[in-house]
């Protein structure tokens, strides 16, 4: 969710629209429309760009406590639900420290968002060494910079 600035994404979307691509936003496939309905509407192809996959839970004590959430939820609440605003229906809890469990690109995005949200110290907790982290080196570098 942090990989590209919104202005770049908006520019790329405009380029696609100029080529005749129809972009449908605010659509929850399965609730607003089904894939079958899209084909019935005349679409010949459907690309679902839903971002990162479902979160993986570790089934450990404490993972359902207040203040613990998946990176997907955290990033969605910040980017789409404006949870960084105090008047948000579901504001993000502000803390002095945050632990991000995982070593992938989404974990790096969550760590960077936590810093941007004012968290003093962010720890990335990963089961292996830094060299084995699946996050792109560029993502790791940006996370360390922030």
Task: Describe the residue ranges of each PLM region.
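Residues forming the flavin
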Residues: 1-146
